[in-house]
Structures are given as C-alpha cells and as structure tokens.
C-alpha cells in the first residue's frame, strides 16, 4: 500500500513534467511558425525596399 501511494506521487510528478514538456514543445512549434511568418514579412519588406530603390534610380 505504501509503495502504491509512492507510485501515485511519482505518476503525479510525471504528469506535471509531461504537461510542462508538452507546453514547451507547443511553444517551440508556435515560435517556429511565428519565426517563419516574421521571415516572410522581412523578405517582402526587403523586396519592397529594393523595388523602391530601383524605382527611384
């Protein structure tokens, strides 16, 4: 019975760390998507700036 109670504590800890790990993975995934989004914006801004420079010359 004592072992079982200990096991439950371990399981609870595991669930907590798994939750944290899933959150971490989710945030990383979001960051990846977000950085791709930012990269595309920067790319278009650079293209636009180059276009403006070419137009002015």
Swiss-Prot record:
Per UniProt, the keywords (alphabetical) are:
Plastid
Q: Where in the cell is the protein located?
A: Plastid
Q: Which GO terms describe its cellular component?
A: plastid
Protein name per Swiss-Prot or TrEMBL: Uncharacterized 7.2 kDa protein in rps2-rps9 intergenic region
């Amino acid at each position: 019975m004592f072992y079982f109670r200990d096991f439950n504590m371990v399981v609870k800890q595991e669930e907590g760390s798994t939750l944290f790990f899933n959150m971490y993975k989710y945030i990383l995934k979001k960051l990846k998507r977000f950085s791709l989004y930012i990269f595309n914006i920067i790319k278009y801004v650079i293209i636009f700036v180059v276009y403006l420079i070419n137009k002015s010359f």
